From Swiss-Prot:
GO terms for molecular function: aminoacyl-tRNA deacylase activity; ATP binding; proline-tRNA ligase activity. Catalyzes the attachment of proline to tRNA(Pro) in a two-step reaction: proline is first activated by ATP to form Pro-AMP and then transferred to the acceptor end of tRNA(Pro). As ProRS can inadvertently accommodate and process non-cognate amino acids such as alanine and cysteine, to avoid such errors it has two additional distinct editing activities against alanine. One activity is designated as 'pretransfer' editing and involves the tRNA(Pro)-independent hydrolysis of activated Ala-AMP. CDD domains: ProRS-INS, ProRS_anticodon_short, ProRS_core_prok. This is Proline--tRNA ligase. It comes from Pseudomonas syringae pv. syringae (strain B728a). It catalyses: tRNA(Pro) + L-proline + ATP = L-prolyl-tRNA(Pro) + AMP + diphosphate. The keyword Aminoacyl-tRNA synthetase applies. GO terms for cellular component: cytosol. The keyword Nucleotide-binding applies. SUPFAM superfamilies: Class II aaRS ABD-related (SSF52954), Class II aaRS and biotin synthetases (SSF55681), YbaK/ProRS associated domain (SSF55826).
C-alpha cells in the first residue's frame, strides 16, 4: 500500500480529552476518530489491526469446534423479560420502541437470543454438545464512556454459547474454551493472566476472566507469589493474616468523639492504630423493610460483590439512608458499631480476630474504646466481607498475595441451567424425558484487545506493534523518491516484498514531507520494521534497516534485503 493511495491520518498533538495511552495513540496514529461520547469510527489503519484480531479469534474458535453464526443486534424485550434481565440489567441496556409501540433493546450480549434459537432448533440429546459463536457489534449505555475503546458505548465482541445435556459435558467444553482463549492471547503476543471471577449479571456458577497486565487497567487482579492461584479482587477470598485473637488488655470505656465522622478522623484525633478500628456499614436486608449491618476493619474495604451474595443481604446491595439509620438506630453514620446495635450484623473474618478495638457507640459523637469479643458482646455471624490486600495469605495456602492492574479482555462462564430453565430450553434426554440444557458462554472484547495491546506495548514515540498485529509489517521509506535511482530501487523492492507476502506501507509522500516527519509517523503508527532507500545508501550498495524496538539502524546489502527481512519478520 502506498501512502498516496491510503488515508494516512496521523496527528502531532495529543487530544486534550484522551487520558490513557491507547486512546491518545489510536487518535494520533490515525486508527480511530471520535464521533460522539463513547462512539468511534475505525479508519483504515485501525481496521487493519482489528481485522487481524478477528482473524485469530475466528481461527481458534473454529479449531475448538465452535460454529460461526450471526444474530440480530436488535432484540425484542419479550426475551429479556422471559429471562428476568429486562429489569435487572438496568440503565446500561439501550432500549427503544418501534413504530408499533413494541419494546426492543440494542444487544449488549446475546444469551436470550441464542437460548431462543436453541429451544427452537434443538430437540434431542443427539444434537449435543453444540457451541456457536459470532463476532458482532454490541451496545451498552455507559454512564461515563471513557478511555477511548476501553469503555465505549459501542464495541466489537466475540461471544460464543454452548449447550449440553449435563454439567460434565459443559465442563469439557469450558476447559476447551479456556485453552482456546489462552491460545488466542498467546498468538496475539499479549502478557495475560486468567483469573477466577464473579459471574455478575450474566449469572451462573464458575467463571474466569482473562486480563492483559497493564498499569492503566481498571481492574485489580490478585496473584499468589507461591502458586498459580489468580483471581480478580471481587472473587479473591480474604484470609486473615492473624491466626488467633489476642487477649484483652484494655477496659471498655465510652469516649466523647465530637465531630468524628470518619475512620481517618478517629485515628488522627485519638491516636488509634487504624487496624484497631472498625467500619459499620448498614445495608438493606434480604427481608423487605429490614436493615442489617456489615462490619469490617477500618483499614479494609467492603467487597460489595461478596456482600450482595450473602443470603441475609438484599441483592443488589443498597446502603441505608441517613433517615433510615436515624429511624432504626437513633444515630448517624460515623457513630455506629456492633455493641448494643438494635440490628443483626455480620462481621468480617478479620474483625472476629480483633481485640481492644474501637467502635461507634450508636450515639452521636460517642465511641467505645477497648472493645473485646465475648467479654463485651457475643461474636455475631462471620463471613468474608472485604477486598484482599497485598500481603494477605493466598487462599490455596501457598504464598502471599500480590495485586496488579489488569484490563479484562475475555470472560468465560458456566451458566448452568439459569437461562434454559427460565426460557424452557429443553431436549429429550437418553431416557426420553425432557432435560434443561446446561449452558456456557464465552466472550472476548475484540476492539478492547486492540487498545489493551497498545497499553502494553508503546513508548514515547508511539505504538510498538508485534508482527502479528501490526497494520503493516514493513515501512518502506524512500528519501528523495523523486530521483530516478531511488524511485526505481524503491519500486522494485516494494514489488519484491509484496510478492513475498509481506504487508508493506510505502511512504511516497513528496519532498514537502521531510524525512524526519516520515520517520516519526512510522514510529507513531508502530510498524515493526523500517527500510530506508537513499541515494547515498544505493551508491554503497546498501539499504538501511531499523527495528521499531531498536534505537540504531543497520546497513543491509541490497542483494540480501529480501532474505534478511524474511528472517526478521515473524509470520
Amino acid at each position: 500500500m502506498r501512502t498516496s493511495q491510503f488515508l494516512l491520518a496521523t496527528q502531532k498533538e495529543t487530544p486534550s480529552d484522551a487520558v490513557v495511552v491507547s486512546h491518545q495513540l489510536m487518535l494520533r496514529a490515525g486508527m480511530i476518530r471520535k464521533l460522539a461520547s463513547g462512539l468511534y469510527t475505525w479508519l483504515p489503519m485501525g481496521l487493519r489491526v482489528l481485522r487481524k484480531v478477528e482473524a485469530i479469534v475466528r481461527e481458534e474458535m473454529d479449531a475448538a469446534g465452535a460454529l460461526e453464526i450471526l444474530m440480530p443486534g436488535i432484540q425484542p424485550a419479550e426475551l429479556w423479560q422471559e429471562s428476568g434481565r429486562w429489569e435487572q440489567y438496568g440503565p446500561e441496556l439501550m432500549r427503544l420502541v418501534d413504530r408499533h409501540n413494541r419494546e426492543f433493546c440494542l444487544g449488549p450480549t446475546h444469551e436470550e437470543v441464542i437460548t431462543d434459537l436453541a429451544r427452537n432448533e434443538l430437540n434431542s440429546y443427539k444434537q449435543l454438545p453444540i457451541n456457536m459463536y459470532q463476532i458482532q457489534t454490541k451496545f451498552r449505555d455507559e454512564i461515563r464512556p471513557r478511555f477511548g475503546l476501553m469503555r465505549g458505548r459501542e464495541f466489537v465482541m466475540k461471544d460464543a454459547y454452548s449447550f449440553h445435556a449435563d454439567h460434565e459435558s459443559l465442563q469439557v467444553t469450558y476447559d476447551r474454551m479456556h485453552l482456546a482463549y489462552s491460545n488466542i492471547f498467546t498468538r496475539l503476543g499479549l502478557k495475560f493472566r486468567p483469573v477466577e471471577a464473579d459471574n455478575g449479571s450474566i449469572g451462573g456458577a464458575g467463571s474466569h476472566e482473562f486480563h492483559v497486565l497493564a498499569e492503566s487497567g481498571e481492574d485489580d487482579i490478585v496473584f499468589s507469589d507461591g502458586s498459580d492461584y489468580a483471581a480478580n479482587i471481587e472473587k479473591a477470598e480474604a484470609i486473615p493474616r492473624e491466626k488467633t485473637r489476642p487477649a484483652a488488655t484494655e477496659e471498655l470505656r465510652l469516649i466523647d468523639t465530637p465531630n468524628t465522622k470518619t475512620i481517618a478522623q478517629l485515628v488522627e484525633g485519638f491516636g488509634l492504630p487504624i487496624e484497631k478500628t472498625v467500619k459499620t456499614l448498614v445495608v438493606h436486608a434480604a427481608e423487605e423493610g429490614k436493615l442489617i449491618a456489615l462490619i469490617i476493619r477500618g483499614d479494609h474495604e467492603l467487597n460489595e460483590i461478596k456482600a450482595s451474595q450473602l443470603e441475609q443481604v438484599a441483592n443488589p446491595l443498597v446502603m441505608a439512608s441517613e433517615a433510615e439509620l436515624r429511624d432504626a438506630i437513633g444515630a448517624g453514620a460515623g457513630s455506629l458499631g456492633p455493641l448494643n446495635l438494635p440490628l443483626p450484623c455480620i462481621i468480617d473474618r478479620s474483625v472476629e480476630l480483633m481485640s481492644d478495638f474501637s467502635v461507634g457507640a450508636n450515639i452521636d459523637d460517642k465511641h467505645y474504646f477497648g472493645v473485646n469479643w465475648e467479654r463485651d458482646l457475643p461474636v455475631p455471624t462471620v463471613a468474608d466481607l472485604r477486598n484482599v490486600v497485598a500481603g494477605d495469605p493466598s487462599p490455596d495456602g501457598k504464598g502471599t498475595l500480590e495485586i496488579k492492574r489488569g484490563i479484562e479482555v475475555g470472560h468465560i462462564f458456566q451458566l448452568g441451567t439459569k437461562y434454559s430453565e427460565a426460557m424452557k430450553c429443553q431436549v429429550l434426554g437418553e431416557n426420553g424425558k425432557p432435560v434443561n440444557l446446561a449452558m456456557g458462554c464465552y466472550g472476548i472484547g475484540v476492539s478492547r484487545v486492540v487498545a489493551a495491546a497498545i497499553e502494553q506495548n508503546s513508548d514515547e514515540n508511539g505504538i510498538i506493534w508485534n508482527d502479528t498485529l501490526a497494520p503493516f509489517q514493513i515501512a518502506l521509506v524512500p528519501l528523495r523518491y523523486e530521483t530516478d535511482a531511488v524511485r526505481e530501487a524503491t519500486d522494485k523492492l516494494y514489488a519484491d516484498l509484496t510478492a513475498a507476502g509481506f504487508e508493506v506501507l510505502l511512504d511516497d509522500r513528496d519532498k514537502k514531507t521531510s524525512p524526519g516527519i516520515k520517520f516519526a509517523d512510522m514510529e507513531l503508527i508502530g510498524i515493526p520494521h523500517r527500510i530506508v532507500v537513499s541515494d547515498r545508501g544505493l551508491a554503497e550498495g546498501n539499504l538501511e534497516y531499523k527495528s521499531r524496538t531498536e534505537s540504531q539502524p543497520q546497513a543491509i546489502a541490497v542483494a540480501d534485503v529480501l532474505s534478511f527481512i524474511q528472517g526478521k519478520v515473524n509470520r
